[in-house]
Amino acid sequence: MAEKVNVCIVGSGNWGSAIAKIVGANAAALPEFEERVTMFVYEEMIDGKKLTEIINETHENVKYLKGHKLPTNVVAVPDLVEAAKNADILIFVVPHQFIPNFCKQLLGKIKPNAIAISLIKGFDKAEGGGIDLISHIITRHLKIPCAVLMGANLANEVAEGNFCETTIGCTDKKYGKVLRDLFQANHFRVVVVEDADAVEVCGALKNIVACGAGFVDGLKLGDNTKAAVIRLGLMEMIRFVDVFYPGSKLSTFFESCGVADLITTCYGGRNRRVSEAFVTSGKTIEDLEKEMLNGQKLQGPPTAEEVNYMLKNKGLEDKFPLFTAIHKICTNQLKPKDLIDCIRNHPEHMQTL
């Protein structure tokens, strides 16, 4: 790595802007980092003015993180290659569907000894069906190592400076320290583990469970039912990792990326909120995304679809009744009120005494 570590944030949505507050402050304060942090911003017009100009002049992302000032050393750049070309650390924080295209644009245009870290909670569709981990796509396309950061980190609360924890999954110990230094703050405590695949899978699967929690809220079934859905969701997450990513540690599920992220997403996240409105309003998920998320996309429904493809291929849908039911509700194959019937006889309840 260079004497001073250059950092680029690829993405500037709600979460990207919140993390820019921490990364920018650390880059300015710590001697190992270059002070200037570039942030790739998809250019759009806001009231007749370019979003990058607004961010660089006012140090506020008025579209995705209104009311929060970004550090002055975070510089918005509308050209992806220009933002990333000098980076030693690339922080990817964009909707997962953009990653293959971004990697194509960056191939051969970044430092060969750079490292990446993905903050993206979702899977991509693998060729031939199934799922591909975002960190694997980044490594495969860009030929650089890619760690992951996942946790109970609702963007607005992180931006407010409220205390929380996060988990970095990094298979190569030599990168663990520099990544922890870049993200650790008084209010944002980082634990580094080597079990990177499990950390990343947790970050995606919990969005499916959060949709289930939202359906329960929309149906007004109460806290006991919601707790049951969360617990069964955790058990299905553990089982899914066991089947498709064997060798992971059970302890990883008790880090912030696991049970903590699951709880916070099932009570406060956008997947829960939109899923509740899906039940109460009768509108489509697409319409609710436009209405409630400023055009941003939910991760839960597409992740449920990708996971269902994998379960179907292995004949395992009946072993994952919660994931299966949530997918079917999101695709209008089942009514939300059918959710509980689907999990009444969950494998978790079929113990032999």
UniProtKB/Swiss-Prot annotation:
Pathway in which the depicted protein is active: Phospholipid metabolism; alpha-glycerophosphate cycle
Subcellular location: Cytoplasm
Pfam families tied to this protein: NAD_Gly3P_dh_C, NAD_Gly3P_dh_N
Binding locations of NAD(+): 11-16, 98, 121, 155, 270, 299
InterPro entries in the record: 6-PGluconate_DH-like_C_sf, 6PGD_dom2, G3P_DH_NAD-dep, G3P_DH_NAD-dep_C, G3P_DH_NAD-dep_euk, G3P_DH_NAD-dep_N, NAD(P)-bd_dom_sf
Catalysed reactions listed for this entry: sn-glycerol 3-phosphate + NAD(+) = dihydroxyacetone phosphate + NADH + H(+)
Any Gene Ontology CC annotation: cytosol
Record EC number: 1.1.1.8
Record GO terms (molecular function): glycerol-3-phosphate dehydrogenase (NAD+) activity; NAD binding; protein homodimerization activity
Residues that bear Blocked amino end (Ala): 2
Superkingdom of origin: Eukaryota
Residues binding substrate, per UniProt: 121, 270-271
Active site: 206 (proton acceptor)
Keyword vocabulary terms for this entry: Cytoplasm, NAD, Oxidoreductase
GO biological process terms, semicolon-separated: carbohydrate metabolic process; glycerol-3-phosphate catabolic process; glycerophospholipid metabolic process
UniProt-listed PANTHER family: GLYCEROL-3-PHOSPHATE DEHYDROGENASE, GLYCEROL-3-PHOSPHATE DEHYDROGENASE [NAD(+)]-RELATED
Quaternary assembly: Homodimer.
Family per record: Belongs to the NAD-dependent glycerol-3-phosphate dehydrogenase family.
Protein name (Swiss-Prot/TrEMBL): Glycerol-3-phosphate dehydrogenase [NAD(+)], cytoplasmic
Organism: Drosophila virilis (Fruit fly)
UniProt gene name: Gpdh1
